[in-house]
Swiss-Prot record:
CDD domains: EF-G (cd01886), EFG_III (cd16262), EFG_mtEFG1_IV (cd01434), EFG_mtEFG_C (cd03713), EFG_mtEFG_II (cd04088). The gene is fusA. It comes from the Bacteria. Residues 10-286 form the tr-type G domain. Keywords: Cytoplasm, Elongation factor, GTP-binding, Nucleotide-binding, Protein biosynthesis. This is Elongation factor G. It comes from Nocardioides sp. (strain ATCC BAA-499 / JS614). It is found in: Cytoplasm.
Length: 703
């Protein structure tokens, strides 16, 4: 069933399914693909089964839905599901997928409630103001508690849940849901079928009172978010289903409420109403409206693009994937205009022209080649050579740069040593391909040892990348022990440090004099590091304008190798105060060398310190082991931030240096007889205590 791709944009939904790693996201997505498949295959379950089997092979390889965007159809609406990874090491992937979504469904584990990773993803969704609804899953499991999960959404996510459904029955007796908008019951009876059919019934008598109470709460919450509802509610008038649905949609799109539904995807209960809600309450590309980018020449000049085919083409490359049969596929969200196979576009970030090869729409288990695609759609494209994740593609005559994405710097690195000469060559290809796909994966070579060093967001992140090198690129390599990616910065201001570079060898010499000041670069609002900053204070042409960028470049190059132990320096403000030049002997190179050396000398006097990555760690443990766990965290130089009771267990939140967390999995297991679990994510950089810093510096210097 190839549907004409020029779908009415009102009927398109670009959604993400976001969740903690075990909340049942893949199962939910799989069931969505299964039911949406049924609507066109009229119950040919063997095809549905084929889709499912195909998904399971993918899961064996540990990937959640092969495709970065899967298109399916529900009640003549096109739903593009954009996958978001659930593990904290892949925050870059989450950021990137949120950037191209219009709305999201957050899946919660009905037993565990709101988990740390859910909070991280939720915060990222707040940053991009993504309208979202919630699906409380796994209500058939022992210990599942829908109402506690809703309370946690308020406490931990600071959200305004709008409960649209209540569970009927609990744990193994979970039968279905009460629909509070239509005031009816939806039940899925009998385990034998795949849950395609459900009954619409009267609300069971024993739930009538609870349903009335929650219907009242629904109206109260809606009236606070919507003036029209408020007026009618205060006058005591009744609402039609259509009026309520329109109000829920308005409040959801304004990000004032988050509709909450429930069910169990694994037992096939509650998925169709979830799809209905996606269509009814989440935004279409038209609701999101125009996207604002900036001009190629001037970052401060705003350029807008409306989601219409008549506008000039603009799109964002948000994911690169390697397809075993097709090679490199780049996923693009088209924001405006049309994208046609065979056309030429320009990469607005690097200025290169790109020819669009084939354009594919990705379905659950097949890809469909299409000739062209309009605004608001998400497709995969072949044939692009110089485009990376986060780049903008646009009409050559009307260029625009869409907001680029910022990714955190890697915090952990390992040395990787290919076993043979042929592995060396394959490693180069693998690294190139993987760093194209993943901007948080970086590579450098150690100048002293000549080793290749790869860096990423956590141990799991690097393990998966090394595993992919082995499997996809057949690279056999030995991998060193993980090392922490330290940084350096300064704590004191040094004013008017002078350095003169001169060299006289036959012919023209080199001459440059610079006077610089260094100081810590701090953001006054957050009191955290504000990155590198260069200020030019030179007046009266004492350093010609064309040489000033060279001083800046020299200082930045000096920052790549800090003065303490050669780690990259961060958060330094450099001010060029004065200088001198020579008509014949001065050059860009001379000023670059002067800037570089002046920076190094001044940095040594500016009280340089070592910084280390701190991780926010959350440990869940039975109370009997509480003292042991806290003692262990303290011994790792951790700072306990909070502890609370949750479902009979104790949950400890702490900030711990990454260098002290290696091997924590095994230690925690043995100290708590395997009964405790933990999760961790990067938080910030903090100063290393003097005694430990001295040891690290000695080790690096080989003393």
């Amino acid at each position: 069933m190839a549907v004409d791709i020029t779908t009415d944009l009102n009927k398109v939904r670009n959604i993400g399914i976001m969740a903690h790693i075990d909340a049942g996201k893949t199962t939910t997505t799989e069931r969505i693909l299964f039911y949406t498949g049924i609507t066109y295959k009229i119950g040919e379950v063997h095809e549905g089964a084929a889709t499912m089997d195909w998904m399971e092979q993918e899961q064996e390889r540990g990937i959640t839905i092969t495709s970065a965007a899967t298109t399916c159809w529900w009640k003549d609406h096109q739903i593009n599901i954009i996958d978001t990874p659930g593990h904290v090491d892949f925050t870059a992937e989450v950021e990137r997928s949120l950037r191209v979504l219009d709305g999201a469904v957050a899946v919660f584990d009905g037993v565990a409630g709101v988990e740390p990773q859910t909070m991280t993803v939720w915060r990222q969704a707040n940053k991009y103001a993504v309208p979202r609804m919630c699906f409380v899953n796994k209500l058939d499991r022992t210990g599942a508690d829908f109402f506690r999960c809703v309370d946690m959404m308020v406490e931990r996510l600071n959200s305004t849940p709008l409960v649209l459904q209540l569970p009927i029955g609990a744990e193994s007796d979970f039968l279905g849901v009460v629909d509070l908008v239509g005031m009816r019951a939806l039940t899925w009876r009998g385990e034998t079928k795949m849950g395609e059919d459900y009954e619409v019934e009267e609300i069971p008598a024993e739930l009538a009172e609870q349903a009335a109470e929650y219907r009242e709460k629904l109206l109260e919450t809606l009236s606070e978010a919507d003036d029209d509802v408020m007026e009618k509610y205060l006058e005591g008038e009744d609402f039609t289903v259509e009026e309520l649905e329109a109000a829920i949609r308005r409040a959801t799109l304004a990000d004032k409420v988050n509709p909450v539904l429930c069910g169990t995807a694994f037992k096939n209960k509650g998925v169709q109403p979830l799809l209905d809600a996606v269509v009814k309450f989440l935004p279409s590309p038209l609701d999101i409206g125009e996207i604002i980018g900036h001009s190629v020449k001037d970052e401060n000049e705003k350029v807008s693009r409306k989601p219409a085919d008549s506008e000039p083409f603009s799109g964002l490359a948000y994911k690169i994937a390697s397809d075993p049969h097709l090679g490199k596929l780049i996923y693009i969200r088209v924001y405006s205009g049309k994208l046609e196979a065979g056309s030429t576009v320009v990469n607005s970030v690097n200025g290169r022209k790109e020819r669009i090869g084939k354009v594919y729409q990705m379905h659950a288990n097949k890809r469909e080649e299409i000739a062209s695609v309009g605004a608001g759609q998400i497709v995969a494209v072949m044939g692009l050579k110089d485009t990376k994740t986060g780049h903008t593609l646009s009409d050559p005559q009307h260029q625009v740069v869409l907001e680029s994405m910022t990714f955190p710097a890697p915090v952990i690195e390992v040395a990787i040593e290919p076993k043979t000469k042929s592995d060396q060559e394959k490693l180069g290809t693998a690294i190139q391909r993987l760093s194209d796909e993943d901007p948080t994966f970086t590579v450098k070579s150690d100048e002293e040892t000549g080793q290749t060093i790869i860096a990423g967001m956590g141990e799991l992140h690097l393990e998966i990348l090394v595993d992919r090198m082995r499997r996809e690129f057949r690279v056999e390599a030995t991998v060193g022990k993980p090392q922490v990616a330290y940084r350096e910065t300064i704590r004191r201001k040094v004013e008017n440090h002078s350095y003169t570079h001169k060299k006289q060898t036959g012919g023209s010499g080199q001459f440059a004099k610079v006077i610089i000041s260094l100081e810590p670069s701090i953001d006054p609002e957050t009191n955290t590091g504000a990155g590198y900053e260069f200020v030019n204070n030179v007046s009266g042409g004492r350093v010609p304008r064309e040489y000033i960028p060279s001083v800046d470049q020299g200082a930045q190059e000096a920052m790549e190798f800090g003065v303490l132990a050669g780690y990259p320096m961060v958060d330094v403000k450099v001010t060029l105060e004065d200088g001198a030049y020579h008509d014949v002997d001065s050059s860009e190179l001379a000023f670059k060398i002067a800037g570089n050396q002046a920076f190094k000398e001044a940095a040594r006097q500016a009280k340089p310190v070592l910084l280390e990555p701190m991780f926010a760690v959350e440990v869940t443990t039975p109370e009997t082991f509480l003292g042991t766990v806290i003692g262990d965290i303290n011994s790792r130089r951790g700072h306990i931030q909070a502890q609370e009771e949750r479902h009979g267990d104790m949950v400890i939140s702490a900030l711990v240096p990454l260098s002290e967390m290696f091997g924590y999995v095994g230690d925690l297991r043995s100290k708590t007889s395997g009964q405790a679990s933990y999760s961790m994510e990067f938080d910030s950089y903090a100063e290393v205590p003097q005694g430990i810093a001295d040891e690290i510096i000695k080790k690096v210097r080989g003393e």
